Amino acid sequence: LKNFLKKNQKKIIKELDIFYSKYSKNKIITITGTNGKSTTAKLLDLILKDHKKDSRLCGNIGNPILSQKKISKNTLFVVEASSYQIAYSKFFKTNYAVILNISPDHLERHGSIENYVSAKFKLITNQSKKDFAFLNSKDRYLKNKIKKSKFFSRLINVNPKLTNSFNKKVVNPYFLSQGNRENLSFIFSISKKLKLKENKILKIINKFKGLKYRQQIIYNSNKITLINDSKATTFASTMNILKVLKKVYWLVGGIGKLGDKFTLKKNECKNIKAYVFGKNKNFFIKKFKNKISYYCFKDLNTALKQVLKEINNSRDNLHRTVLFSPAAASFDSFKNFEERGKHFNFLLKKY
């Protein structure tokens, strides 16, 4: 079967192509990027629904793209697309292409960072003159790709920093990290192009509870905050939140990603203690390069037990944060990041 599929690769049509063949006349907004795809797609879908739009959230977020029902000419689709889905598609096109960010990921599958960027950028090269592409042109990986590529869509450069007026109006603690704030910049940019109302956008943003296992606040008190960020499978997805937290007990471990780098400076790590668990501890220790205090444990259970013991024994009144953000794939011990996230919540209840 493997040889047959390889030999007939060009004849195989993927789900994005079948979807496009059915709904090419509908408006399609496709969101990709290394981090923040699901959160951004979900938030945009909620905003559109609040504007009484017949919005359908589908794709890699878990709602099968081909199982949508009762579609009318006014239906618009918010599609979360992975690099694999885009790379293997043949003629899929989107009216609005959104590339949130790029950092090294899935290089085992794509072979190189260049191939990975090309897979994402295919969303834009497949567009026509009537279409729009949203990206941060200062992104280190996209900058060169823009210069070297031929594309026809209208490029909208998104400033990753929110304007002061919007910053003051976003009071939801879920958007504390730099990464989540940058994703909001895309939300505002897309919403502006779609002529959506600012007051309604802000209402949804400030009510947004976040998605499971994505910087999800499990418990919060004056003494301690517990965050389940099991979805974090790279350093890039974890570092944004590490930068804004104080007195952090960071639970990290799993299968490290090829090409991944821990780029925080030593002075940015002074409030962080890393509790490294699992079989691949050396991967993380080498990446830390003595910039961070770390302790090693055989598994998540023993690491969490030690963290909670230290916090319970602390004599000061300083607020502490337990951050479960593995910065690695889960397949060494779990089926996927969801199972890993559920296990962490189970352990919290146990202790």
Task: Indicate residue ranges for each PLM-predicted region.
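Short beta-strand-centered segment that lines the nucleotide-binding/catalytic pocket of NTP-utilizing
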Residues: 53-65
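Residue-level signal for inorganic ion chemistry
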Residues: 12, 31, 60, 100, ...
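Short internal beta-strands
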Residues: 133-137, 251-253, 270-279
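Flexible active-site lid/hinge loop adjacent to a nucleotide/diphosphate
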Residues: 71-175, 332-338, 344
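Short, basic phosphate-binding NTP loop
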Residues: 1-30, 51, 212-216, 300-311
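Nucleotide phosphate-binding/pyrophosphate-handling subdomain across enzymes
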Residues: 54, 173-271
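A conserved segment at the C-terminal end of the G1
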Residues: 39-56
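C-terminal helical cap/extension that packs against the catalytic core
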Residues: 260-320
